[in-house]
């Protein structure tokens, strides 16, 4: 293959052209990303740099976005495993990362709190370094390798939506690699140890996973099994504005084997082959083989266009190959180099953004390579082929013998590199920053997350950017999914800064787990300059509350004009015959519309459809995977909407001084097209608690009549111009009497990008604008009301609203918890009462655990319909006057009118004043003062009643809120106490275990010490006393013991001799007898034999072994040697003699054969000549005989065919003539009938065709297969003869034997009604069609249900008359069967 010398300049330039490396970047000027928030300077470990200048550098002052100049050349990062710290900043070009001691497998440190784990499947995987992937992840499925009970390899596929699972089998050896084509794909590829390729297409059918094999390429049976095989899909690049993903986009796949790489075009393979599996030897096209490495291939990558393959090998080389599958060109090496000085490579990652590809940014601009199981990573620039940064991973000093074995993977956006260590229970997340303009790419930070087990393989599902608060607005390119608020509270961060949520599936040594990590990375931009606003973020809208998206549907109108007049033409008694006995046959159009009873229900003035406005809430389905599971001990208000009233500004400076916005953002209220109210951002400290927003299920908004649907009580506008921009959120606890709504169309302008105020505070401010005293300002003069193009200062307004009072109290004392405020649209007297009650509730809430500020957005429904209608009219009038006036002095009056008429629950003084002004303007000199006084008294009485009712409602509301708040506090207190008790119990158990461990260690040390002392004592005593005791005992034995024994034993010996002699004689006889019996006993002999055998076995065995080894074996060897020598000599001599005899015999045989061959050859030649002559004669004879026989047979066959053809033609002509005669007879009969009708003076409609033309047209329709149209035309003509003609022409089985029935329900009903008119003639065909038509009626069809009873009742009556009139008819049996069928179908109520 190609070598280093074969690479020329043209090949390298071709690679640069493919990768778009020489393209200018002039158009890319404004794409640099900037962040608003300052970056935390907390470190997760110890940073050691070689240069002193880098030590004093402030982390928050570093511009990480450019990454052009690194602060130091050498940096050592010692990870500590501290979960409470932030991620560590990387500043050096050559960085060494030392693993923490807590990440060791033997360490008992707990996992990180930022990692949320959910078990998916339990299985024991072997802990080793896997070259391929054990798991593959897509948006809908996960697949992982496993083994069955018999040890065979399998792939388990699990659906993420339905939890349905299946097994994929047929794998040889074990699974070496798994991969989906891309995240949105349902094509799963698998490679086994034999190199066989499996590609399945996964689909969901009726809740079950269906696996269809798309490609199965099988290797030969003698293929060497290898675990070093990889799958590389061609990357999927989403198109701009692409919604539906076509799964056939990734049809190119590369397979890496030990010595070669293969690139396959699956589309060509599927086109050429239909059955699977297919042997690789049978495939002739659609693939290409790449060879050129001297070591084992470890990694690879395909370019997005599929024309370049990059391979990394254990020989240390990375090579780029130009490939063309469809052509005949061999792969050509474009470039090669050693990134790690020849060390074996284990990683090859190109830093391309596959989530959102910029067409101006070239592919393969930066490259990450890894060596020695990714213990060393390097970032490369593919333009200059220079190393930009080097990262080295080292073990901790306490376990230096266990080297890291890292698995690395980039997310789709190429912003984060995720690494797991097979030897340690840790996961690293490294943030990658790319600068296309400067040609720099570096790692800017690293985060360490401790796990419970080492990760052997993992698959990244998604990496989302999310805010710390749900109400924060994300940029358009970021995902708007956010994690649960309970999980955000655990992050202990008070800033509304951006965070990252990583979702991945990990294969541990014990289980497969769903892992979710939320952390706050470094901000890749400098702090924004005070007073400078970002243009792209000045205007932002309040987002919809997550999980709730309610849309108003347009009201349904119940008027029906066009169809009523047509329906009225249909008589309800259409089954009754007229006096002239002419049948009134119903056409199929009569059965197309609902019955009269249904029409009356629709057109009734009291109908629900015509009087009610249907409002349908639609809940947006959020991804359940993005919301983390909440801990069971944490409790939130499930029935209240919790909103934070503080507008928090992030502090980019290090000293934490609060900042105030220099501009006043404007809030646009939906429904007031020309009204813009400017609200300044409140200056708040940065220590406010984060927003806690409870996820609520969408509630159905109660339907209301048109007189109530535009009530000004609802905060959102009643206009239907943009209904999708006005979502409503209803609180469950206040559903009976209140409706809470949050307008989503609020737009805030002028907000600085570095200081985002709370969007929910803006919503509360917009709510405040709708209160009666909504124009009061905190800073007196900086909040003008803009109507049209004029500005009116708000110094006219005197009374502050409840929301402003709450904000002022928050500014005075931010440390005290704030109570629940009441509804904003209340009177001045009620507001004063509520302020007092709020202060009392604030004093009672000092000991509360919850320190958040809540606002309850609520509106009251008035029970007085007339007052509500009048309030609505006033509001419409005031809004019309405001929108119609634009300048001059009249604006002041308009604003006052708007203040007084905006809400029906405004202050009595303002209402009284506005009504008085209107009456003064409206009255004329002819109206008396008495009438004015009466009207004023009535108005005052109405106001007093409404105010009293509102006061009672508000008091009841306040009591309910206080009760709920007390219950919530009790629940929170119980939760905290339970949590504290569990923590104390856990700590006590840990201390108890530690004390027990110390005591056990002490006992163990004491036992070891005692054992050591006893051993030393015994050793010293045995050494010192053994010699002395031995000598003393020997001397004493010689001197005293022998003499004493001799003196004592002499008399005893004499006595024993005499007694023994006497007893021996007595016993001798007994012994002889007993011994004789014993010897003759079989058991004794067996026992003696066994004992003798046991005792002699070892001795005899050893003796025989020694004798055999010393005597037999040498003698046997010598004898065998001499014997084999003699045999060898004899064999040689015999072989030589045999060869001589064989040669002589062969020579004699050869001579004899040569003598006999010549005459045989001569005879064979003669026989061949004679055979040729005979063959020629036989050929001529056979040809003549065959020709004559064929002619004879053809003559006979032609004669038979003539006879049969004549008979067939005659029969066909006879049938056609008879059929034509029948048609002619029918035409003549119809002509006569028409002539008779015309003679009677009945006018013939001009639109009707004559009977013959109708028959012809119907016959054409039936010949074309349009059976329904043919029957419909015949039924529409209202002619029974035409209907019977169609029924006789078409067989009933041909019509009703199909499924579904080709005749529609109206046609069936009309056919039944017309055929049942008269059973006197052609009864059989009528009964056959009626039986089949009745059986094919669809009872679920509304038209059939409306008309079936009447039609079938008529058929039953006609059948009954027929049976009574003709009891002896042969068709009585089918008629009775049809009658019984009709009695079962027609209910008694319809008969």
UniProtKB/Swiss-Prot annotation:
For this protein, the record's PROSITE patterns field holds:
WD_REPEATS_2, WD_REPEATS_REGION
Leader peptide range in chain numbering: none
Tell me where on the tree of life, at the top rank, the source sits.
Eukaryota
> Which residues lie in Basic and acidic residues bias regions?
915-924
- Where mainly located? cytoplasm
Describe where the WD repeats fall, as residue ranges on this chain: 170-210, 226-274, 292-331, 340-390
Annotated Gene Ontology cellular components are: nucleus; P-body
PANTHER family referenced in this protein's UniProt entry, alphabetically:
ENHANCER OF MRNA-DECAPPING PROTEIN 4
Task performed by this protein? In the process of mRNA degradation, seems to play a role in mRNA decapping.
Q: Which family does it belong to?
A: Belongs to the WD repeat EDC4 family.
Provide the protein name: Enhancer of mRNA-decapping protein 4
Organism of this sequence: Xenopus laevis
Q: Give the encoding gene's name.
A: edc4
């Amino acid at each position: 293959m190609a070598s280093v010398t074969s690479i020329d300049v043209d090949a390298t330039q071709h690679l640069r052209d493919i990768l778009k490396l020489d393209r200018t970047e002039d158009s890319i000027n404004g794409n640099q990303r900037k962040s608003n928030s300052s970056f935390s300077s907390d470190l997760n470990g110890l940073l050691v740099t070689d240069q002193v200048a880098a030590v004093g550098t402030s982390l928050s002052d570093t511009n990480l976005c450019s990454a052009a100049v690194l602060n130091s050349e050498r940096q050592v990062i010692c990870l500590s495993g501290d979960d409470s710290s932030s991620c560590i900043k990387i500043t050096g070009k050559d960085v060494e990362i030392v693993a923490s001691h807590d990440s060791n497998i033997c360490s008992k440190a707990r996992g990180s709190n930022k990692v949320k784990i959910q078990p998916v499947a339990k299985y024991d995987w072997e802990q080793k370094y896997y070259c391929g992937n054990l798991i593959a992840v897509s948006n809908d499925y996960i697949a992982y390798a496993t083994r069955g009970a018999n040890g065979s390899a399998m792939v388990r596929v699990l659906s993420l939506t339905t939890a349905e699972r299946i097994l994929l089998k047929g794998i040889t050896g074990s699974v070496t690699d798994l991969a989906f084509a891309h995240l949105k794909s349902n094509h799963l590829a698998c490679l086994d140890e034999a190199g066989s390729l499996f590609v399945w297409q996964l689909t969901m059918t009726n809740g079950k996973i269906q696996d269809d094999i798309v490609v199965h390429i099988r290797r030969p049976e003698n293929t060497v099994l290898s675990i070093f095989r990889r799958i590389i899909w061609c990357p999927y690049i989403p198109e701009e504005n692409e919604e539906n993903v076509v799964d056939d986009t990734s049809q190119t796949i590369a397979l890496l084997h030990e010595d070669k790489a293969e690139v396959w075009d699956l589309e060509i393979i599927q086109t050429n082959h239909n059955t699977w599996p297919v042997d690789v030897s049978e495939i002739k096209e659609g693939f290409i083989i790449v060879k050129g490495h001297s070591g084992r291939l470890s990694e690879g990558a395909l370019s997005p266009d599929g024309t370049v393959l990059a391979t990394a090998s254990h020989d240390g080389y990375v090579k780029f190959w130009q490939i063309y599958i469809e052509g005949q060109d061999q792969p050509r090496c474009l470039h090669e180099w050693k990134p790690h000085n020849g060390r074996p490579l284990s990683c090859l990652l190109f830093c391309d953004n596959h989530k959102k590809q910029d067409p101006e940014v070239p592919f393969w601009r930066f490259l990450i390579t890894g060596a020695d199981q990714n213990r060393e990573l390097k970032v490369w620039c593919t333009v200059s082929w220079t190393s930009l940064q080097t990262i080295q991973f080292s073990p901790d000093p306490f376990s230096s013998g266990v080297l890291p074995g890292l698995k690395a993977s980039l997310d789709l956006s190429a912003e984060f590199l995720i690494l797991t260590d097979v030897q340690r229970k840790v996961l690293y997340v490294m943030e990658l920053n790319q600068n296309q303009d400067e040609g720099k790419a570096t790692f800017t930070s690293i985060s360490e997350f401790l796990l419970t087990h080492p990760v052997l393989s993992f698959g990244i599902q998604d990496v989302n950017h999310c805010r710390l608060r749900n109400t924060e607005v994300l940029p358009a390119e970021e995902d708007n999914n956010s994690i649960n608020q309970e999980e955000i509270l655990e992050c202990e961060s008070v800033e509304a800064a951006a965070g990252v949520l990583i979702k991945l599936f990990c294969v541990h040594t014990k289980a497969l787990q769903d892992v979710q990590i939320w952390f706050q990375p470094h901000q890749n931009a400098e702090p924004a300059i005070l007073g400078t606003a970002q243009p792209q973020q000045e205007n932002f809208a309040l987002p919809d509350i997550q999980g709730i998206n309610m849309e108003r549907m347009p009201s349904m109108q119940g008027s029906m004009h066009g169809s009523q007049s047509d329906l009225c033409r249909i008589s309800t008694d259409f089954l009754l015959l007229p006096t002239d006995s002419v049948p009134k046959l119903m056409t199929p159009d009569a059965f197309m519309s609902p019955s009269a009873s249904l029409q009356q229900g629709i057109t009734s003035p009291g109908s629900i459809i015509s009087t009610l406005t249907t409002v349908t809430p639609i809940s947006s389905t959020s991804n359940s995977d993005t919301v983390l599971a909440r801990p069971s001990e944490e409790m939130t208000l499930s029935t209240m909407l919790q909103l934070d009233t503080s507008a928090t500004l992030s502090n980019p400076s290090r000293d934490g001084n609060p900042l105030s916005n220099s501009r006043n953002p404007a809030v646009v209220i939906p429904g007031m097209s020309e009204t813009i109210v400017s609200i300044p951002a409140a200056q708040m400290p940065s220590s406010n608690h984060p927003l806690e927003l409870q996820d609520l299920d969408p509630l159905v908004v109660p339907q209301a009549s048109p007189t109530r649907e535009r009530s000004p009580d609802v905060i959102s506008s009643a206009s239907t111009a943009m209904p999708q921009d006005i979502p409503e959120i209803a609180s469950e606890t206040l559903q009976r009497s209140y409706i809470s709504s949050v307008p989503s169309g609020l737009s805030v302008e002028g907000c600085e990008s570095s200081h985002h105020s709370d969007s929910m505070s803006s919503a509360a401010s917009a709510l405040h604008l709708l209160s009666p005293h909504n124009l009061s300002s905190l800073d007196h003069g900086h909040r003008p009301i803009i109507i049209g193009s004029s500005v009116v200062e708000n110094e006219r307004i005197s009374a502050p609203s409840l929301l402003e009072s709450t904000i002022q109290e928050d500014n005075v004392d931010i440390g005290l918890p704030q109570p629940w405020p009441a509804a904003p649209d209340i009177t001045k007297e009620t507001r004063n009462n509520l302020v007092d009650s709020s202060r009392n509730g604030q004093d009672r809430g000092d000991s509360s655990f919850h320190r958040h500020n809540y606002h309850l957005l609520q509106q009251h429904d008035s029970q007085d319909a007339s007052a509500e209608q009048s309030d609505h009219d006033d509001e419409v009038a005031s809004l019309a006057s405001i929108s119609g006036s634009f300048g001059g002095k009249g604006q002041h009056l308009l604003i006052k009118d708007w203040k007084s008429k905006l809400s029906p629950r405004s202050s009595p003084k303002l209402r009284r004043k506005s009504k008085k002004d209107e009456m003064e303007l409206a009255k004329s000199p002819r109206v008396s003062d008495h009438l004015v006084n009466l009207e004023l008294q009535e108005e005052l009485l109405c106001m007093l009643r409404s105010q009293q009712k509102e006061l009672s409602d508000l008091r009841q509301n306040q009591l309910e809120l206080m009760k709920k708040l007390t219950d919530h506090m009790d629940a929170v207190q119980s939760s905290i106490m339970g949590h504290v008790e569990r923590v104390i119990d856990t700590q006590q158990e840990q201390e108890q275990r530690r004390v027990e461990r110390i005591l056990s260690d002490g006992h163990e040390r004491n036992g070891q010490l005692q054992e050591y002392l006893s051993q030393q004592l015994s050793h010293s005593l045995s050494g010192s006393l053994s010699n002395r005791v031995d000598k003393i005992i020997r001397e004493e034995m010689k001197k005293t013991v022998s003499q004493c024994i001799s003196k004592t034993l002499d008399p005893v010996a004499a006595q024993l001799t005499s007694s023994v002699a006497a007893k021996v004689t007595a016993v001798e006889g007994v012994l002889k007898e007993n011994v004789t019996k014993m010897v003759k006993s079989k058991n004794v002999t067996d026992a003696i034999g066994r004992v003798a055998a046991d005792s002699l076995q070892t001795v005899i065995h050893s003796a025989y072994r020694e004798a055999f080894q010393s005597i037999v074996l040498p003698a046997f060897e010598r004898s065998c040697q001499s014997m084999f020598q003699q045999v060898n000599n004899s064999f040689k001599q015999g072989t030589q003699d045999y060869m001589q005899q064989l040669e002589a015999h062969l020579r004699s045989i050869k001579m004899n054969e040569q003598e006999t061959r010549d005459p045989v050859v001569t005879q064979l030649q003669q026989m061949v000549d004679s055979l040729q002559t005979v063959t020629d004669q036989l050929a001529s004879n056979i040809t003549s005989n065959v020709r004559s026989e064929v002619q004879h047979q053809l003559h006979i066959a032609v004669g038979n065919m003539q006879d049969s053809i004549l008979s067939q033609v005659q029969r066909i002509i006879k049938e056609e003539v008879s059929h034509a005669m029948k048609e002619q007879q029918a035409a003549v009969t119809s002509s006569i009938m028409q002539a008779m009708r015309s003679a009677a003076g009945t006018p013939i409609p001009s639109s009707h065709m004559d009977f013959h033309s109708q028959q012809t047209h119907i016959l054409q329709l039936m010949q074309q297969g349009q059976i329904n149209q043919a029957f419909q035309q015949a039924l529409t003509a209202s002619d029974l003869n035409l209907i019977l003609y169609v029924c006789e022409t078409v067989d009933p089985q041909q019509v009703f034997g199909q499924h579904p029935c080709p005749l529609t329900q109206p046609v069936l009903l009309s056919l039944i009604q017309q055929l049942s008119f008269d059973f006197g003639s052609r009864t059989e065909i009528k009964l056959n069609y009626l039986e089949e038509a009745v059986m094919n009626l669809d009872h679920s069809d509304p038209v059939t249900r409306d008309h079936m009873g009447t039609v079938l009742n008529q058929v039953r009556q006609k059948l009954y008359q027929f049976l009574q009139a003709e009891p002896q008819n042969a068709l009585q049996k089918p008629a009775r069967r049809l009658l019984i069928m009709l009695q079962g179908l027609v209910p008694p109520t319809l008969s």
